[in-house]
């Protein structure tokens, strides 16, 4: 294991639009060592949130990673399957978002995010997980229909 906690190499992200693609982040590279404090600073629209979403693989469509490597604790995140990265994210990565509106995964429903926590951290699956999700949603007065969107 190296002393690098995070290594981003030549990361590029594009938004694929009907009229073509638009580069959001182009060939960004940096590394963070274990115990190092790091800040990602830039103007609004400069790609900070896009970089963070890319490194934890939560980019909402139409954004796609078109190039690069994201290595966290010697694991190439971009080479993992969707299920593998989901488990890795839950066990190895913590992020504090600047805004509460960005705290949830933008590409998953609230229902599925709650279910993931139950499955990964409490080993509750299937019908038991579905019932627990409904119970938790009722506690905060969110309908299951709203939690699916």
Predicted regions: what is each one?
Residues 1-149:
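ABC transporter nucleotide-binding domains
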């Amino acid at each position: 294991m190296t002393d690098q906690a995070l290594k981003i190499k030549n990361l590029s992200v594009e938004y694929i639009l009907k009229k073509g693609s638009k580069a959001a982040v182009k060939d960004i590279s940096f590394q963070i060592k274990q115990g190092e404090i790091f800040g990602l600073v830039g103007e609004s629209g400069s790609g900070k949130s896009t970089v963070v979403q890319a490194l934890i693989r939560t980019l909402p469509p139409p954004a796609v990673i078109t190039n690069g490597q994201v290595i966290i604790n010697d694991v190439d995140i971009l080479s993992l399957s969707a299920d593998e990265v989901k488990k890795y994210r839950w066990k190895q990565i913590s992020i504090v978002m600047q805004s509460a509106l960005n705290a949830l995964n933008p590409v998953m429903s609230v229902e599925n995010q709650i279910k993931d926590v139950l499955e990964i951290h409490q080993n509750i699956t299937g019908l038991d997980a579905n019932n627990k999700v409904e119970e938790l949603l009722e506690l905060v007065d969110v309908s299951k229909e709203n939690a699916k969107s």
